[in-house]
Every structure is written in structure tokens, then in C-alpha cells.
């Protein structure tokens, strides 16, 4: 959608009115500085990863490095994905080599049908690698991962199953066919596979999943449930709950932004206006929520009982910023200012680690799952990934605008 003259005029007025604020056009030097710091800090992390031959995930409660799990870990694609973005920015071959090296460690996971996070794992690693290099071996691996992922699709439900419920903590919740809002993020790989292969089967699954999720996951105020459980035979909704939020009816911060990012993706590939409208509604809900602090970095749950004395979630903020940058390119509304404000605050000393600190992760103060007493107020590899992605999106956008002015 082309931006209206009204939006363009509004942005100009906004830039004049806020000329002293961080939400004005981001100087290219500032973006360079932030990306250069990300490269320096992640270089230190890379040294540790190479020495251990493991993929960094987070830091434990007692201050030790926590590597991704053996077997399968939904976060294992983010570190090589960050390396791909840093290769795109620096053109330094060490990042390409690092990304290739670490994604190779989980290549066989593309054939594991027990996990729904194959899109997270493989799109963020091999998908970025294929986008940047065009390596056909990466394309083959992505196709395998996509074929495995769609085996979890139930036509009666119309969705891809999230967790299996025959073991672990998931077996204790009484679920039959749980679908989590996070699963919207796995659709990007499917849409991309239809684009690069010409086979609509991937896109058909993605569209069905997005449509059913749009129908059942969102409350009248556009906030999202975390988990919707379905009857696998009839396709009917059994219950709506949470796993990582404060309560079943609360608004888990990262869940809201998974939905924002997911429907922005859906619009990118389909140009179906209902997805754009949904993304805009979620964005407006997040931006205008009364629980969002002035620095725009949310508490881990908008309804957490001890606000303002609750942990922030920098990962949710980074995901939001990245999604808003893309959404701004499709919408008549101005979402870029909010994205820049979030990134400016994430880049402050309150959230951005000092060089060599924070176990060499970039961002501090993220939350994995408070109900599971896991990864609370720690760095997370996906917070770094989406922060760097957001910076790269802004960097590429600014370069595009500067080139258009020259032409």
C-alpha cells in the first residue's frame, strides 16, 4: 500500500515537532555505531561459542553461560541468524563462516516431526543464509524443514499443532491440540517456500493457520490468548489459556508481539487486507496500552500484579520494533517513530550491555517464562537477534531513502 500524502505530511510535522527527540530520522552514523557495537560484542560471544562448540542461549541464575539443549532447542537458530545479519552489515567473511558452522550443528533437526518451531529454527538461520547467499543447499534444507513442519497440520482444526502433550509439563495441562500465538512466527518459512518453489501447499497451510488463529486467539480488545486448545476430531475450541503469561486472561507481552510480527508477515506475502488490519490493530493495542512504560520496554505481562516492580522484557520490545519497521512500509499510519523510540531506548545503558559484559550478549533484561521460573531478567539470544534485525531493517531503509534522494 502506498503511503498517503496525509501520512507523509504528518511525518514531516512530527519530525519538526520532535526535532530534539530520538524519534526523528535516525542518523546513519548512529545506526552504524549500534551495529558496529553489536558486531564487537557478538565477536566476543563467538569466541566463547567456538571454544565450547555450542550455541549460546542465555545466562543461568547463578551467572553461567547456558547453551542450547542437545537434541532440539527452539532458540538454536537465533545465534547463527544474528551472524548472518552481521555478515550482511560488515561483509566480513568470519560471520558467514560462523553462521554456516553453527547452523550445521542442527541441520538434522529439519527431519524431526515432534516440534513446531522448525520455522523459528530454520528460517532464522538457513533462511537468512539463503536470502543473503542464494546457496541452493540451504534451499534444500529449508524445503525439508517445511515438509516436516506441515505434517503437524490438522485440516479439521486448520492449524499446525504446537506442543505434543504426551510428556513433560505439557502433558499435565489437559490439552489435546494446543496452538500457541508464537506459532504465527513459523509461517514465514512456509510462505517463503511457496515463493521460492512455486508449490502452494506451504502457503495454503500458512493461510489456514493464520485465519483460524485470527478467529480464535484474539479477544474483543485485540489482546491475544497464549494457548488455544482444539478438539483434534471436530476442530472445536476446547479452552483458551496461558503457559507463559501471568494468568489465562492476562496479556503476556511477548505473545502480543508474536501476533503483531506474524500478521505483518502474512500481509507481506498475501497482500490480504485483513492481515494488514489485524497487524495495525495489534500495533495500536501495544503502543497505546496503559501498562507500557514511558521508555516503551514492556513488563513481561501487561497485567502482572506488581507493576511497576515487575521484570521488563527487552525481547518483546525488540520484536515489536522490528515488526513495526516493516508494518510502517505497508500502512498509512506512522509506526516508524515508535520503532525508533523503542530502539533508542534499547540502545541506552539501561538495556544495552557494556562491551565485554553481560556474558557478551547485546541486550540485558529479558524474560523467558516466569510461570516456569525460567530465564528471568537475563539476556536471551532471540532478544539480540530481533534487535539486530530491527537495526538492519532501519539501516537498509535509510540507505534506500538516501539512494532515492540521490536519484
Positions of PLM-derived features:
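Bacterial Sec-dependent N-terminal signal peptides
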Residues: 1-29
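Glycan-recognition and catalytic cores of secretory/periplasmic carbohydrate-active enzymes
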Residues: 25-407
Amino acid at each position: 500500500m502506498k503511503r498517503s500524502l496525509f501520512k507523509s505530511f504528518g511525518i514531516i510535522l512530527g519530525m519538526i515537532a520532535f526535532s530534539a527527540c530520538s524519534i526523528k530520522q535516525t542518523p546513519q552514523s548512529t545506526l552504524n555505531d549500534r551495529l558496529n557495537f553489536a558486531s564487537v560484542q557478538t565477536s566476543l560471544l563467538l569466541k566463547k561459542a567456538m571454544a565450547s562448540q555450542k550455541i549460546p542461549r542465555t545466562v543461568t541464575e547463578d551467572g553461567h553461560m547456558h547453551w542450547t539443549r542437545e537434541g532440539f532447542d527452539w532458540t538454536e537458530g537465533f545465534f547463527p541468524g544474528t551472524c548472518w545479519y552481521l555478515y550482511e552489515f560488515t561483509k566480513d567473511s568470519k560471520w558467514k563462516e560462523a553462521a554456516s558452522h553453527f547452523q550445521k550443528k542442527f541441520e538434522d533437526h529439519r527431519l524431526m516431526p515432534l516440534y513446531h518451531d522448525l520455522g523459528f529454527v530454520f528460517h532464522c538461520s538457513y533462511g537468512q543464509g539463503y536470502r543473503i547467499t542464494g546457496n541452493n543447499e540451504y534451499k534444500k534444507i529449508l524445503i525439508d524443514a517445511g515438509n516436516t513442519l506441515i505434517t503437524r497440520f490438522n485440516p479439521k482444526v486448520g492449524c499446525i499443532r504446537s506442543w505434543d502433550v504426551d510428556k513433560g509439563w505439557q502433558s499435565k495441562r489437559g490439552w489435546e491440540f494446543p496452538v500457541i500465538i508464537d506459532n504465527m512466527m513459523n509461517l514465514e518459512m512456509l510462505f517463503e517456500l511457496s515463493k521460492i518453489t512455486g508449490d502452494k501447499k506451504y502457503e495454503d497451510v500458512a493461510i489456514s493457520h493464520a485465519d483460524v488463529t485470527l478467529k480464535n486467539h484474539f479477544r474483543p480488545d485485540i489482546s491475544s490468548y497464549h494457548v488455544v486448545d482444539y478438539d483434534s476430531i471436530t476442530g472445536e475450541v476446547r479452552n483458551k489459556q496461558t503457559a507463559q503469561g501471568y494468568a489465562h486472561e492476562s496479556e503476556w507481552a511477548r505473545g502480543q508481539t508474536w501476533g503483531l510480527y506474524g500478521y505483518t508477515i502474512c500481509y507481506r506475502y498475501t497482500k490480504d487486507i485483513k492481515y494488514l488490519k489485524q497487524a495495525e490493530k495489534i500495533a495500536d493495542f501495544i503502543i497505546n496500552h496503559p501498562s507500557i512504560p514511558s521508555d516503551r520496554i514492556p513488563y513481561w505481562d501487561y497485567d502482572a500484579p506488581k507493576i511497576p516492580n515487575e521484570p521488563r522484557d527487552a525481547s518483546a520490545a525488540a520484536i515489536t520494533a522490528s515488526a513495526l519497521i516493516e508494518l510502517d512500509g505497508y500502512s498509512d499510519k506512522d509506526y516508524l517513530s515508535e520503532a525508533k523510540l523503542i530502539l533508542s531506548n534499547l540502545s541506552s545503558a539501561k538495556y544495552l550491555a557494556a562491551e565485554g559484559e553481560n556474558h557478551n550478549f547485546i541486550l540485558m533484561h529479558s524474560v523467558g517464562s516466569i510461570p516456569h521460573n525460567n530465564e528471568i531478567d537475563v539476556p536471551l539470544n532471540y532478544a539480540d537477534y530481533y534487535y539486530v534485525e530491527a537495526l538492519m531493517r532501519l539501516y537498509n531503509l535509510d540507505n534506500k531513502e538516501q539512494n532515492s534522494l540521490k536519484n
